[in-house]
Amino acid sequence: QERVRPCLFMNKVDRCILEMQMEPEDMFMRFRKSMEDVNVIIATYNDELLGDIQVAPEKGTVAFGSGLHGWGFNVERFAKIYASKMGVDKDKMMKRLWGDNFFNAKKKTWTNVMQPEGCTEPLQRAFCQFIMGPIAQLMRAIMNEDKPKYEKMMTTLGIVLKGDDRQLLGKPLMKRTMQIWID
């Protein structure tokens, strides 16, 4: 009756990375399956006045994060960052950061094929390469107390800890770092 457009929050991303030790591609597959399941339910309540209300990361209607640790992001957050770095439109980048889109860093080209002709190794999915990979690397480096690695990543990402935050270790450091970077 209220005609509210749905959005979806994929919670417990931290658990996928730290407890379940999932690789970015496995997380992508799990997220995609969950979205498909949600969209099947949404389709049963189709309202012609609202139009297409299915949730999709490239439409900005899906967010990922950790409710427990107080951080979350949508694809648009990263699309803004990479669009400015690569000199492309943010909306175009949003579409590239989800689905079967792969970036060939050697050729600096985009493709929708995981292993195009001439590539000896399969390419990483853009969502995994540009979003989940860096998040997983940073979180794991912090939790494994690999200070040189996480400090280098934090510097590269522009994450600056202030005051008492500089004394944090382990989960509190991971939580604070993600809040600063992602939010």
Predicted regions and their residues:
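Structural and coupling elements of P-loop NTPases
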Residues: 1-183
